[in-house]
């Protein structure tokens, strides 16, 4: 992921356009140079922040692996969220924390973590994952309407089947078979043929027929 971000930043450095014509050519070239310099400084600062955030994430993972006190892990997570709220590392750490809280059946805490991710991270994949996990957390609490609302989060087409399938789960839990069948069917239709989730999804469909 870090390598991908660095490649994207390098590409973004070349995305500036200036039309330089007539007697304004020299002035525009100077403005372009200044603008490019400022943009490069901004990008370098962003790259530095991403590296710092990744270091905090690595520290969190290490503490978790070493079974450090939860208070220490939570302190590192808060530091990451406050200092680098829009970084991929902050989103990853918060998703990990949500999973831990879910496993411990602290659903309200997991819910808060996932809502934080949705509010602070705009990456399409992470948005889809957070929305899906939030739907599952709310389903576990039988907050069906809230779960469906979370699963209505706009996502890219590639990730839509994930939310559709979970919507089907919510409807199935309410014994609303027709709605569940509809969402399972739409998810299966949009899911790639080689997806590892197709078999399980087909089983869900068949169980309702």
Swiss-Prot record:
Q: Name one GO cellular component term.
A: plasma membrane
**InterPro entries registered for this protein in UniProt:** SecYEG/CpoB_TPR, TPR-like_helical_dom_sf, TPR_rpt, YfgM
Q: Which residues lie on this side of the membrane: Periplasmic?
A: 43-209
Q: Which residues lie on this side of the membrane: Cytoplasmic?
A: 1-23
Transmembrane region(s): 24-42
Q: Where in the cell is it found?
A: Cell inner membrane
Give start and end residues of every TPR repeat.
Answer: 161-194
An MF annotation (GO) of this entry: protein-containing complex binding
Q: Keywords of this protein's UniProt record, alphabetized?
A: Cell inner membrane, Cell membrane, Chaperone, Membrane, TPR repeat, Transmembrane, Transmembrane helix
Which Pfam families does the entry link to? TPR_21
Top-level taxonomic group: Bacteria
Q: How does it sit in the membrane?
A: Single-pass type II membrane protein
Q: Which family does it belong to?
A: Belongs to the YfgM family.
Role noted for this protein? May mediate protein transfer from the SecYEG translocon to the periplasmic chaperone network via its periplasmic C-terminal region.
Q: How does it assemble?
A: Interacts with the SecYEG translocon. Forms a complex with PpiD.
Q: What is this protein called?
A: Ancillary SecYEG translocon subunit
Native organism is Neisseria gonorrhoeae (strain ATCC 700825 / FA 1090)
